[in-house]
A protein has these predicted regions:
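Bacterial Sec-dependent N-terminal signal peptides
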Residues: 1-25
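Phosphate-group recognition and catalysis centered on beta-loop-alpha active-site segments
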Residues: 22-181
Length: 181
């Protein structure tokens, strides 16, 4: 009797969405690291921007729902040193604001609304890197673009969110240099 109760509890635990998501992310990670992989991995550029604004949490969530393997997001640093998702140097194209990301504080950026692919305003706001990583955690790999030059800031957030193993980061230096640094 005790054994059957244990098995039922174990099954209930294993069927929880968080557990299954973590299993999925780890499987994707193994695929990424497999040099002999014989299948194609699907990457959503700036999330699923056809459904939600690019580089938004909603675009990441949509990519996860579509069972995409990797989501590519772009990072910029604000005037007060916070990391936000934004492809362009400026906020003009993707929000209802104007100016450069580096000239705005996080509070100013959080007041803005993101535009959809057709330029219409949405209810979505510009997410921080931390918000994006927490949305992706355990469910999908994340390819961080425009992040290498702010590596220390990015890595601190990866450590804080426990997502370092789920991130791919591009850089302009040879692997040997990166390992030394």
């Amino acid at each position: 009797m005790k054994k059957s109760k244990f098995i039922v509890l174990l099954l209930l635990f294993c069927l929880q969405p968080g557990f299954l998501a973590a299993q999925r992310a780890e499987a994707i990670r193994k695929d990424v690291l497999n040099p002999r992989l014989d299948k194609v991995l699907v990457v959503a550029h700036r999330g699923n921007w056809s459904i939600a604004p690019e580089n938004s949490v909603a675009a990441i969530d949509s990519a996860i729902q579509m069972k995409v393997d990797i989501v590519e997001i772009d990072i910029r640093k604000t005037k007060d040193g916070q990391l936000v998702l934004m492809h362009d140097d400026t906020i003009d194209r993707t929000t209802n604001g104007t100016g450069k990301v580096k000239d705005k504080t996080l509070a100013e950026i959080k007041q803005l609304r993101l535009k959809d692919k057709d330029g219409r305003l949405t209810e979505h706001t510009v997410p921080t890197l931390e918000e994006a990583l927490l949305a992706a955690k355990g469910q999908i790999m994340v390819n961080l673009d425009k992040a290498y030059n702010i590596f220390d800031d990015v890595y601190a957030i990866l450590e804080k969110t426990g997502t370092a193993d789920l991130v791919i980061m591009k850089g302009g230096h040879p692997v040997e240099t990166v390992k030394r640094e």
